[in-house]
Curated annotation (Swiss-Prot):
InterPro entries: ATP-grasp, ATP_grasp_subdomain_1, D-Ala_lig_Van_CS, D_ala_D_ala, Dala_Dala_lig_C, Dala_Dala_lig_N, PreATP-grasp_dom_sf. Keywords: ATP-binding, Cell shape, Cell wall biogenesis/degradation, Cytoplasm, Ligase, Magnesium, Manganese, Metal-binding, Nucleotide-binding, Peptidoglycan synthesis. Pathway: Cell wall biogenesis; peptidoglycan biosynthesis. This is D-alanine--D-alanine ligase. It is found in: Cytoplasm. Belongs to the D-alanine--D-alanine ligase family. One of its GO terms (molecular function) is metal ion binding. Cell wall formation. Pfam families: Dala_Dala_lig_C, Dala_Dala_lig_N. The gene is ddl. Binds 2 magnesium or manganese ions per subunit.
Amino acid sequence: MTGKHVAVLMGGFSSERPVSLSSGTACAATLEERGYCVTRIDVDRNVASVLAELKPDVAFNALHGPFGEDGAIQGVLEYLQIPYTHSGVLASALAMDKDRAKKVAAAAGVAVASSLLLNRFEIGTEHPMEPPYVVKPVREGSSFGVVIVKEDQTHPPQIISSAEWNYGAEVLVEKYIPGRELTCAVMGDRVMDVCEIIPVGHQFYDYDSKYVAGASSHVCPAKILPNIYQKIQTMALTAHRAIGCRGVSRSDFRFDDRFSDDGEVIWLEINTQPGMTPTSLVPDIAKAAGISFGELLSWMVEDASCLR
């Protein structure tokens, strides 16, 4: 028995609530198996009062999306002086903003795709850049709201400027990078293996590919040239450090090897709250390094701190 009381924060009120519940449930059960005293908290607007009364030794942040990974819950935990997992206030807020995170990563020497930051209503009926391109909400995760505009489309999709759009006014319009989906995790100062994601029946690594069993396969370590492998690892660690991440992060990449095995590698984004569901990438990447799911979670709990 470790004796540590761990509050697992899950659920919340973002569009990623179902993912968070899946992550939190898996993490809580495994931490109990490891000997921790676990309290499951389905986060609502009164979470600060709940945590202040509970006084756990550590908060395991299994939240995803706004409030959970944008610096908000991190600020609550800092104020309450409860050590917590993953990145701190500033790094979380920065990583959640895809545009600003890209600029910081690029300034540190990481290769990124050309992009524009726009209000979605500015797009209208004219292409903001030559297709193909991708439109992404600036502050969403799990591929919510991602729209791929193909070369043969004469106008941007109407959904972007319609009333049905629920992902905020700011969008990132980014050059579409063809090729393979690759990802790389960082655990503290240790860069992990590179993993290839192969969506099954999907154009890209969308919500279903991420969370539906059998909708994607993970090849870890990825079957790519050693120099490309090392380049991706270097870029993942550079982005992790430049943005100020702590604990575990995961960077996503596109590798265009259509014309050469030594093709272009582009960093897409960093995730400071990577999923911990049964189909998630980080547990698979850790497993390839000989680290079990339980060992990974224990490391995260012991790594928890304030002033992150």
